[in-house]
């Protein structure tokens, strides 16, 4: 279902994105670029952002509805944060694409969840990259949900 599947975000390079014809990168928040519910970015994530921000428009698209949590995120990074995105509903992603005056095919949606992140990208007409969690030490319920999602997706 995803156009690309990678171990984590750090495998995404500017060259790869340029070769894909991408001008904007929309990123899921929890478990994709930030350890889930931590409210903090890893130092290597900030370094990765630095490699991308000069060539690409970057935005965070999250289903998170906690205003304190998204406030922390907005303070920590200089990118647009679209909260309460209601993924996989593509409405907010399409609105953001329109706002930045790009074509859907110039955007890539990156996330760790096939049934939310990848589907929203597909519904909005963007390219998609499915990545593994940024956290190798996820709790058991999260690991089970992730395995079930990926198992279901393999059948489509």
Enumerate the language-model features and the residues they cover:
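Asp-based, Mg2+/Mn2+-dependent phosphohydrolase catalytic module
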Residues: 1-27, 34, 38-39, 43-57, ...
């Amino acid at each position: 279902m995803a156009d690309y599947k990678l171990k984590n975000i750090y495998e995404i390079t500017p060259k790869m994105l340029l070769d894909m014809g991408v001008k904007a990168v929309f990123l899921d928040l929890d478990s994709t670029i930030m350890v889930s519910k931590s409210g903090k970015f890893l130092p290597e994530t900030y370094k990765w952002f630095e490699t991308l921000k000069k060539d690409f428009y970057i935005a965070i698209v999250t289903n998170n509805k906690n205003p304190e949590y998204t406030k922390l995120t907005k303070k920590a990074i200089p990118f647009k944060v679209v909260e309460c995105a209601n993924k996989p509903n593509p409405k907010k992603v399409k609105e953001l694409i329109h706002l930045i005056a790009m074509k859907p095919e110039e955007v890539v949606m990156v996330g760790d969840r096939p049934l939310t992140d990848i589907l929203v990208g597909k519904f909005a007409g963007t390219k998609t990259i499915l990545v593994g969690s940024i956290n190798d030490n996820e709790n058991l319920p999260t690991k089970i949900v992730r395995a079930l999602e990926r198992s279901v997706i393999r059948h489509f």
